[in-house]
Amino acid sequence: MLKYITLLLVLVLIHCKQNPAKDNKENTLPPVGTFTGMLRYDRGICNFTDCANGAFYMISDSTMSIPGHYKKACQPAECPDESVFAIVKARLFKGTDPRSDPGTLAIIAIDSMSGKNWSNTCIPWEYWCTGTEPFWNIQISKAERGLFFKNMGDETGKTFDWSPPVSAGNTTTYTAKNRAAPTETMTLVIIKETCSDGMSELVYNYSVTVSIGKEIWKGCGVKSGEPIPKAE
């Protein structure tokens, strides 16, 4: 009987010692926070640029919810390696170095995810071009190393590698190769002149002509740092 009581006391003491350790481990987890920024997902690799401070984080997604949200946000014309605007709940596990390894975001939940536009992106860009008949748009961003072309007419997207433009007078010309098919080249000519997209009452300061092979698209453009077009 004495042995039984002694064994019971030992088990109780062990249990009391284990529970605080478990609680302490849980208390060391980073708090859950809300992060707003630009999320990029490509072939299972995901990263996040924080709009609050510009920090670049890798993402760990145990919820497995990012691929579906990301694909939906990119529609109707997904470009390879494009970023989307996202608000997420996550724990930030800090890395070893603020510059080279700022940390990892462990996703808890996706609050929202939507397509990128000139109003919501916080990654620097040079031009945003758009046209109608069919509807299309192109974002030009040295920071994202690409020209992202969305053709809503046939619901296709292409990413062209960024290269320095050539400027002459009021004309700026980009020549870029398709990231997925380098034999395909895009030539994009931007001219500083009044432009209308033909459908809305918006007035732009730049006209745009895009050539890919034998196909040509015409439209208007917005330059970063200049006022967003308004109706006359």
Give the location of each predicted region:
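C-terminal motif of bacterial Sec signal peptides marking the signal peptidase cleavage site
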Residues: 13-15
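Bacterial signal peptide processing site
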Residues: 17-19
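Structural detector for short beta-strands of small beta-barrel domains
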Residues: 29-49, 90
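Tryptophan-anchored aromatic micro-motifs
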Residues: 35-38, 43, 116-137
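OB-fold (S1/OB) nucleic-acid-binding surfaces
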Residues: 46-67
